[in-house]
Amino acid sequence: MKRIGEIVRATSTVAVARSTDDTVPDLGTALIDENLDDVGSIVDVFGPIERPYLAVIPDGGNTAQLVGRTVYAR
């Protein structure tokens, strides 16, 4: 399980994660949390080259609860 980053913002349709390093995961990468629960999939990468932001389409549920959670690649 590779640590990808932390969710910093969330709306009902998209969450934004900040990458923990300079490695950019592939679009479509499925993300899980520390409990191995599905979080969503990466649909876009934007921002600085160092620690870019990742747009994530959530798998459902209360997306506000995702803020502050660490996410990992499945």
Model-assigned labels for residue ranges:
Residues 2, 55-59, 63-74:
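Beta-strand/loop-dominated core regions that host nucleotide or nucleotide-derived cofactor-binding catalytic loops
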Residues 1-56:
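Short beta-strand/strand-turn micro-motif
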